[in-house]
Amino acid sequence: NNGSWGIEASSGATVNVDGLAQINIFGEDSMGLQAVSTGKIILERAIIKAVGNNTTAVLGDENGGEIYIGGNSIVEAEGEGAKALSATAGYVEMGADALISAVGKGANAVRGNYADAEIKIGESALIEAQGENAAGVYAWWGAVIDVADNAVISADGKNSRGVVAQHTNAEITLGDSTQIEVNGDGAIGLMATAQSGFEGSKINTGEDLLLAVSGNDAMGIYATMGKTAVGAKAQITVDGDNVTGVYAADQGTVTLADKVQISVEGDSAYGIYTNHSGAGASVELQGDTAILVNSDDGYALYAKSGAITSNLNGGTTVASGGKYFIEGDMKTGTDGIIDLLMEQDSIFTGKTDAGDGNISLGLTDSVWNVTGDSTVTHMINQNSVIDMTSDNQGFSTLTVDHLSGNGGKIILDIDGSVAHQSDKLIVTDTFTGNHVLSLKEINAREGDPTLGADAHGTVLASVNGGNGVFTAEDGEGTLYWQRYELDTLNNSNDLYTHWYLKSINTLNPGEAAGALAYHTWRDSGTLLERMGDLRHNGDTAQGAWVRVQGSKIGREGKFKFENKYTMYELGYDQKMKQTDKYTRYGGVSFSYTDGSSSYRSGDGDNKNKAINFYVTQLGNKGYYLDVVAKI
């Protein structure tokens, strides 16, 4: 019947049921369990089902109503606006391994209303909601909900919600290893929000969160005037058109702990998006973070307004960074801020658009693969690589207001067959530090030692003042080195200093290549010395002999190399024939050479083995003939 109850405890009464309690209730506005006005219900184990619009399976009601349900219990509700497990200014506790389910438009599997409402759910709970506008866990206006570790929460339906904390001081805490899956257009995984003029709500998750949201216009995390704190090692996945991984607006804040990964896929997809119409919104990366966006017209980071920053450590300015792996573009709008300290081994692949906002990138021992024209407000390039060759052999321009750092490299595409065809760096304000420009020829002609002669005069960088310095990195061809030289030209018309390609010198390292010929000559020279001994010392020199010798050759400077070796030789010879006109000696030897070579780029080993046959003939008038054969 409509408005009926299964079990009710009120006015201090207590109901205690041992064993399994099974309750089925049907009818609009009906309730399976209700405890109100200090009433208490204790069930060791229960299976409760309520069917009907606006039904509630379990309700811990106002004025101190309390309900305790043991582990391995099932609570289900079905109908429009139905609630499975609910507390309205009362207390409800459910044990481990619970199944809590609600089906219907606007249905809530777990619902807390008003201050003093508290719900606690044990480990490994399965919480399910199905229907348009349905929610798995919902805390409203001061209610507190605590879901222990290893929970699985799902919501399925248009505009469905996985977890919602709404209005004044509502708070939800999720334990470690929580899994949340939400499906439907307009769906949201975690939603913390409030109405204007009220205190915001909070959602806190433990470590190892798995959050998956699917549907057009869907969002992984949504915070407006509310706060969401995501624990370490979370994985957030969102797919569909016009989707967002993390969204913060109108004083909404989201903090992402260490080793969080956000993956977003679809048309007009955003990894992190901040926006506000009044006070600021923010997303703070408090440790290592991966943001992967697969979208032709989306962004990895978009601060339309508000801020996306590295770790603030409780302050208002960035205090520390992290190792970031970011695939996708960055953009800021008016008053928008992106401020990241990209620490060792960070990789950013994408382009940037500072617009009327502020993008600050501090790179230390990191890589930025630039995929198109980009603008940055502040950039530190400290021992990092900015690779502008990732734009499909196009020519891109990187414009930076303030550039600093030391030991950084900027790799530029260049067409070596014509002048003024290259990537370009422009610094519009301050320029400090020492930076290296490295050139990559786009026509795959690195093996051509004449390459670059027609590119003289190409402007590679233009700076508006400052005492920074660019140097060119030498290039390595297959059999040659290229030394690039830069020079500067001050233009009175635009007040910029232009760094251009002055000359290219091609060097053939023949000195190093000649090392092999040198060692071969030294090997033969040893045999010639031995035959000289035979000619001068005759019978006393013949017989077995051993020689060991070593040597080193090389050069210093820009294209230095070093080659060193040790040669071992063992032989035997004797007099072969003697007449009144000449004396002939012959012998055989085995030689082994062990060497190593090191060059400015690369190294190698040199080894040689040979069997040598030799004859020397000395005439009685002083002439001689030496013959050597090698195998």
Residue ranges and their predicted role:
Residues 17, 35, 60-61, 73, ...:
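Polar/charged side chains located within well-ordered beta-strands of beta-rich proteins
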Residues 5-11, 31-37, 56-62, 82-88, ...:
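Glycine-rich beta-solenoid repeat tracts in large extracellular/virion proteins
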Residues 62, 114, 347, 367-375, ...:
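Primarily extracellular Gram-negative trimeric autotransporter adhesin
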Residues 280-284, 292-297, 302-436, 440, ...:
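Extracellular beta-solenoid/beta-roll
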Residues 197-200, 278-280, 579-582:
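Short, solvent-exposed loop/turn segments that connect beta-strands within catalytic domains
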Residues 504-631:
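Outer membrane beta-barrel translocator domains of Type V secretion systems
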Residues 1-3, 14-29, 40-54, 66-81, ...:
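Beta-strand-rich solenoid/repeat architectures in extracellular/passenger domains
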